[in-house]
Amino acid sequence: MARVCQVTGKGPMVGNNVSHANNKTKRRFLPNLQNRRIFVESENRWVSLRLSNAGLRVIDKIGIDAVLVDMRARGEKV
């Protein structure tokens, strides 16, 4: 699935552009996705992930091993 964080599941949101005259038109708010290669010491290999900034913070907080266990439990291929 495109434009979705593999760690947090964050995807695009829908909202409005609001002009000075208060006219509203639909727009999409896209997550801040980055492609990152992260080294997993326990598996001695690199893992490529498409992450939002929040996903990077989750990895910093709980560690890549815990994140990979959670992703595999959801059935995501890593």
UniProtKB/Swiss-Prot annotation:
PANTHER family: 39S RIBOSOMAL PROTEIN L28, MITOCHONDRIAL, LARGE RIBOSOMAL SUBUNIT PROTEIN BL28M. Belongs to the bacterial ribosomal protein bL28 family. GO terms for cellular component: cytosolic large ribosomal subunit. Keywords: Ribonucleoprotein, Ribosomal protein. This is Large ribosomal subunit protein bL28. It comes from Herminiimonas arsenicoxydans. HAMAP family: Ribosomal_bL28 (MF_00373). The gene is rpmB. It comes from the Bacteria. One of its GO terms (molecular function) is structural constituent of ribosome. GO terms for biological process: translation. It holds the Pfam family Ribosomal_L28.
